[in-house]
């Protein structure tokens, strides 16, 4: 199985390529793991890989150009029939059935984010699927990517001595995150939502909360079952659903 990894810290993956079941699979040629560091694609002398988010707020996002160039380089190396995965708390929760689904792929590219995440337009244009390893926060996507590699590799023929072993293997406010955007303002004809450029912090707060509620309702509705929505949250979620229905008509 061919796996490409997009990471600012590729050396972290020695934990799985040098040890254990996955390490043996690499040595035997059953796993071919390759790396692309966005920092190698930065154009300035400081090799900058982060940028400020539109709309303000704490933290930074991964800079669009180095990240996108790294993904494109990995795609070119992979050739046809490669699936690009972004490890993200906003993704589908990784379960064994999901692992089995991904193990059927001959080639995967895993994008390990850092900082507060990546530009939403990169997710829309360059990412095929988002997967999450759980409802908690990590410092980056490297550990989730390693988790996915480890889980998927167990289903690659020959990695385990006995396939029966594999067959027998047994959020801060409770909402998914809202979409994020950084420079450029227009990417492939898709522009940053006007509200994030308005400078009105209250409008931005309400937009982000509404998007967070709506995304949770669409992707992980069971999370809402455990929440007692405030009047504001209930109203914003109703607006999101109404707007979505209007768009689909």
Swiss-Prot record:
It comes from the Bacteria. It catalyses: guanosine(37) in tRNA + S-adenosyl-L-methionine = N(1)-methylguanosine(37) in tRNA + S-adenosyl-L-homocysteine + H(+). GO terms for biological process: tRNA N1-guanine methylation. Keywords: Cytoplasm, Methyltransferase, S-adenosyl-L-methionine, Transferase, tRNA processing. One of its GO terms (molecular function) is tRNA (guanine(37)-N1)-methyltransferase activity. Its main location: cytoplasm. This is tRNA (guanine-N(1)-)-methyltransferase.
């Amino acid at each position: 199985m061919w796996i490409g990894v997009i990471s600012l810290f590729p050396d972290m993956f020695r934990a799985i390529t040098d040890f254990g079941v996955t390490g043996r699979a690499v040595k035997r040629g059953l796993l071919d793991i390759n790396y692309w560091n966005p920092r190698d694609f930065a154009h300035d002398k400081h090799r900058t890989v982060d940028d400020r988010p539109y709309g303000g707020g704490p933290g930074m996002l991964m800079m669009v150009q180095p990240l996108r160039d790294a993904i494109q380089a990995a795609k070119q190396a992979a050739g046809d029939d490669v699936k690009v995965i972004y490890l993200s708390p906003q993704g589908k929760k990784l379960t064994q059935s999901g692992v089995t689904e991904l193990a059927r792929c001959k080639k995967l590219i895993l994008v390990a984010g850092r900082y507060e995440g990546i530009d939403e337009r990169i997710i829309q244009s360059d990412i095929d699927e988002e997967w999450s390893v759980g409802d908690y926060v990590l410092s980056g996507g490297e550990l989730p990517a390693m988790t996915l590699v480890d889980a998927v590799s167990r289903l690659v023929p020959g990695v385990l001595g006995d396939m029966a072993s594999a067959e027998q293997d047994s959020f801060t406010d409770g909402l998914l995150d809202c979409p994020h955007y950084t420079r450029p303002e227009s990417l492939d004809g898709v522009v940053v939502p006007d509200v994030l450029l308005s400078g009105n912090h209250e409008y931005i707060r309400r937009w982000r909360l509404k998007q967070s509620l709506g995304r949770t309702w669409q992707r992980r509705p069971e999370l809402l079952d455990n929440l007692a929505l405030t009047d504001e949250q209930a109203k914003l979620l109703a607006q999101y659903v109404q707007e979505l229905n209007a768009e689909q008509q």
